[in-house]
């Protein structure tokens, strides 16, 4: 570890088909590949799973916590490629009924909404997706030191296995959720050859912090914003802050604040921005100190929390909850932001990743954006051709009001910097 469903039984993981798909290849040190659908990431040891991925806090422990408390309607599992009995590739999976209307912007959004009302089964298919509803970066695990040819071969085998598994569990659409620009550089061609299309997902905001202290960071902001932040911090002077590794005894309050904050969001992404019951306690317990929570109290009462994951060179801000209208009266969002910036600088952590919402504020505060993609394909060839034709009109970023307003002012990181 790195620290610094309707129509189908909900417990899909216990009903995974036991098939194994074998793939023999040439010109590679890998002798023979078999791809197996597994009911959980725990079917592979923690060390064997983590060895396939770059060091990250969103590792086996994180995925296990997500499996134990999924959002409503989600079921989690995994797919692993083996060379003999040695795992050489792996992806986490989830299955969910997904509203296709969510991904279409003008001019198809009106038609999609109409079809959703008239043909709900057509517009709400059962999707089998690579990734996690709790992660903003799609984990594609390939064995360390794999050559380019081996990496392509392992991914192609995983894709073939996914097609078989999707058919076995009744999913008509396959998807890769939030593939980073960095992974798209090597995986795109293989995915396209396998019949996948893609459209933009929501980008991820990243703040680079190569500063010696908070004053240096503030000096990079516009003078008017600096004055505004100083005023907001003075208004929040009564707020008491604690950084903890446990929410024992307060998890009900944390869940309540999270639900309250969801009701104030400008865009609703359904269960994709929700968590399951007891998720926060599971996360804090499973991540052994990599998960921290900033607790803000006013007069002894919890008014805000911010769950974040600590890596060697990056902090991932994952979940925030605030009490309203206190949040606005005391500028708790900005207070949380500056306290997290202070934490990163104090710990010499150079990057603060803040997720897929509230882009306008994050850009003003110095963030840049990492592009990400959703790759998808239908199992039926004709339906897949129709989805391919609709792909240019699909884009989650077009549904976000902040991104529409930012337009060309949004600054994106180049693809080769999208991977930490």
Question: Which functions belong to the PLM regions below?
Answer:
Residues 2-7, 13-32, 95-96, 179-180, ...:
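Active-site/acyl-donor-binding loops of N-acyltransferases
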Residues 6-7, 15, 36, 51, ...:
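Compositionally biased, intrinsically disordered/low-complexity regions enriched for serine, proline
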Residues 25-111, 163, 173-329, 413-418:
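A conserved beta-strand-loop-helix scaffold within acyl/acetyltransferase catalytic domains
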Residues 47, 84, 148-160, 164, ...:
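Polar/charged alpha-helical tracts
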Residues 71-74, 113-118, 126-130, 210-214, ...:
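Low-complexity, flexible helical/coil segments
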Residues 74-77, 82-83, 94-200, 314-377:
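Acyl-donor binding region in acyl/amide transferases
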């Amino acid at each position: 570890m790195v620290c610094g469903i309707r129509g189908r039984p909900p417990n899909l993981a216990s009903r995974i088909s036991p098939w194994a798909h074998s793939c023999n290849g040439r010109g590679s040190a890998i002798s023979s590949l078999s791809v197996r659908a597994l009911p959980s990431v725990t079917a592979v040891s923690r060390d064997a799973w983590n060895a396939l991925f770059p060091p990250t806090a969103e590792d086996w422990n994180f995925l296990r916590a997500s499996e134990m408390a999924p959002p409503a309607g989600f079921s989690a599992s995994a797919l692993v490629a083996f060379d003999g009995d040695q795992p050489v590739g792996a992806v986490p999976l989830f299955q969910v009924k997904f509203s296709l209307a969510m991904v279409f912007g003008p001019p198809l959004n009106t038609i999609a909404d109409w079809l959703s009302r008239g043909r709900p089964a057509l517009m709400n298919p059962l999707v089998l997706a690579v990734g996690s509803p709790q992660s903003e970066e799609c984990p594609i695990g390939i064995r360390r030191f794999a050559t380019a040819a081996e990496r392509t071969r392992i991914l192609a085998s995983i894709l073939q296995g996914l097609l078989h598994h999707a058919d076995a569990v009744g999913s008509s659409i396959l998807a890769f959720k939030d593939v980073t620009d960095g992974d798209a550089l090597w995986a795109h061609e293989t995915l396209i050859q396998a019949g996948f299309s893609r459209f933009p997902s929501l980008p991820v905001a990243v703040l680079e912090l190569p500063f010696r202290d908070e004053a240096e960071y503030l000096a990079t902001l516009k003078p008017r914003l600096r004055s505004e932040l100083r005023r907001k911090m003075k208004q929040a002077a009564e707020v008491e802050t604690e950084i903890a590794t446990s929410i024992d005894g307060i998890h009900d309050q944390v869940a309540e604040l999270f639900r309250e904050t969801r009701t104030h969001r400008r865009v609703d992404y359904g269960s994709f921005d929700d968590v399951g019951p007891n998720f926060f306690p599971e996360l804090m317990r499973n991540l052994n100190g990599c998960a921290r929570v900033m607790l803000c109290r006013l007069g002894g009462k919890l008014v805000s929390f911010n769950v974040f994951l600590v890596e060697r060179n990056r902090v991932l801000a994952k979940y925030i909850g605030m009490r309203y209208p206190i949040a606005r009266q005391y500028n708790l969002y900005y207070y949380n932001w500056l306290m997290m910036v202070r934490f990163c600088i104090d710990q010499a952590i150079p990057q603060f990743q803040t997720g897929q919402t509230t882009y306008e504020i994050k850009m003003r505060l110095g963030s840049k954006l990492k592009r990400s993609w959703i790759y998808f394909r239908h199992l039926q060839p004709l339906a897949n051709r129709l989805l391919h034709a609709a792909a240019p009109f699909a884009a989650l970023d077009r549904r976000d009001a902040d991104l529409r307003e930012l337009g060309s002012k949004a600054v994106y990181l180049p693809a080769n910097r999208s991977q930490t």
